[in-house]
Swiss-Prot record:
Name of the protein in its database record: Large ribosomal subunit protein uL29
Record HAMAP family: Ribosomal_uL29
Protein's organism: Candida albicans (strain SC5314 / ATCC MYA-2876)
One Gene Ontology CC term in the entry: preribosome
Keyword Kinase tagged: no
Length: 120
């Protein structure tokens, strides 16, 4: 098995991916044993990268499923939330920023902004 293509992995089911992962890990184990007799085995590199690709696709699928589960819910796990910056995460929402105290509301109503007309 040469390089595994990621676009091919994305079409496979979870069971197929897990079985392929087991096969790749077994192949890696045999290659590690062969390395003792014959050093400088470049095949180990490709097998390790293939294992990483399979694991990446499995993790992406899991995160996608969890994201779909929490879609529309009030609370979302922190690792699925938008990263943003610390300051942006703490920023007031539009609704919170528009709130005003009762005293400020009464003052705004009692003393509206004056409108001036200019003589032409």
């Amino acid at each position: 098995m040469a390089g595994v293509k990621t676009f091919e992995l994305r079409t496979k089911s979870k069971e197929q991916l897990e079985s392929q992962l087991v096969e790749l890990k077994q192949e890696l184990a045999t290659l590690k044993v062969q390395k003792l007799q014959r050093p400088s085995l470049p095949r180990i590199h490709t097998v390790r990268k293939n294992i990483a690709r399979v694991l990446t696709v499995i993790n992406l699928n899991q995160r996608e499923n969890v994201r779909a589960f929490y879609a529309g819910k009030k609370y979302i796990p922190k690792d699925l939330r938008a990263k943003k910056t610390r300051a942006l995460r703490r920023k007031l929402t539009k609704f919170e920023a528009s709130q005003e105290t009762e005293k400020a509301r009464k003052q705004r109503i009692a003393f509206p902004q004056r409108k001036f007309a200019i003589k032409a």
